[in-house]
Amino acid sequence: MDRQGAVGQLRRTVEEFAGTYCDIDDQWCVALSGGSDSLALTAVAAQLRSTTAFIVDHGLQSDSAAVAETARKQAISLGCVDAQVLCVQIDPPFGPKGGLEAAARAARYAVLGANRNGPVLLAHTLDDQAETVLLGLGRGSGARSIAGMRPHDPPWCRPLLGVRRSVPRAACHELGLNAWQDPHNTDCRYTRTRLRLEVLPLLEDVLGGGVVEALARTATALREDTELIDTFAAQALPNICAGSGLHARALAALPDAVRRRVIRGWLLNGGATGLTDKQIRGVDTLVTAWRGQGGVAVGSTLRGQRLIASRYDGVLTLHCAPV
């Protein structure tokens, strides 16, 4: 493979990532959509290690089966030892948050996780990271939501997270690869598409460029802070647990950020889902502003149920209630 130009840049990037995060004898998988980002990643990955390509067919477009089969054949031609089409079904209702996009993403990660035989390479780029940060800012769900995607979140690997989207596109051109153009990427009914096509270009124009890189740097800094607070929360937890609950007095002694991180982890371990910063702070008031108030409702993984975080006899507890 030509080591010059975009292909060479991608190869060096993936080699450096593998040297940092992957065992030397790891085989790996790559999630391939057929688009330029994942196609270029597949081309490079297959030259470096034994690679299995997984193409997830969500069945959301009339030609999705044909697109998936084309991508499968491309993967084999690029040197993958195996390439499989994995079919998933996305049925409404799509859930309370994120709609169709979130449901498709959840199904995709689930089927990739169930079929993988090693780390899974994902082709998210620096531009994807910037879009993710902006989405998190819009939701206002706390620092974690704007900390972006981790480069390495086992089994998920994102070796291109520091690379602009233009590089894999150029690599496909260098390799003579015909990448699939996902119509969703130009459909402005989707929030991420509008961010990509309208918001980010406007920010680049108004702020004089460098916005994508700046957003990604912000995500990295916040992610480092978030991971440190996670460590402090894990260290504090053994002295706070009261069976399946939490001692309110011991919680109150913790720094604010650490206390709320403990509460977040406790809620998630108890089956909470779709947590917002507002909900976590609401539960926090059961510790810091206790006046005998009622519990705080949060989403549950159980259909038709929600969880109620309450305080009884100085202990935070969780119980289920019908929606």
From Swiss-Prot:
The keyword Flavoprotein does not apply. ATP binds at S33, G34, G35, S36, D37, S38. It is found in: Cytoplasm. GO terms for cellular component: cytoplasm. It catalyses: cytidine(34) in tRNA(Ile2) + L-lysine + ATP = lysidine(34) in tRNA(Ile2) + AMP + diphosphate + H(+). Pfam families: ATP_bind_3 (PF01171), TilS (PF09179). InterPro entries: Rossmann-like_a/b/a_fold, TilS/TtcA_N, tRNA_Ile_lys_synt, tRNA_Ile_lys_synt_N, tRNA_Ile_lys_synt_subst-bd. Its EC number is 6.3.4.19. Keywords: ATP-binding, Cytoplasm, Ligase, Nucleotide-binding, tRNA processing. It is an enzyme of class 6 (ligase). GO terms for molecular function: ATP binding; tRNA(Ile)-lysidine synthase activity. Signal peptide: none annotated. SUPFAM superfamilies: Adenine nucleotide alpha hydrolases-like, MesJ substrate recognition domain-like. One of its GO terms (biological process) is tRNA modification. The keyword Iron-sulfur does not apply. Belongs to the tRNA(Ile)-lysidine synthase family. Ligates lysine onto the cytidine present at position 34 of the AUA codon-specific tRNA(Ile) that contains the anticodon CAU, in an ATP-dependent manner. Cytidine is converted to lysidine, thus changing the amino acid specificity of the tRNA from methionine to isoleucine. HAMAP family: tRNA_Ile_lys_synt (MF_01161). The N-terminal region contains the highly conserved SGGXDS motif, predicted to be a P-loop motif involved in ATP binding. This is tRNA(Ile)-lysidine synthase. It comes from Mycobacterium leprae (strain TN). The gene is tilS.
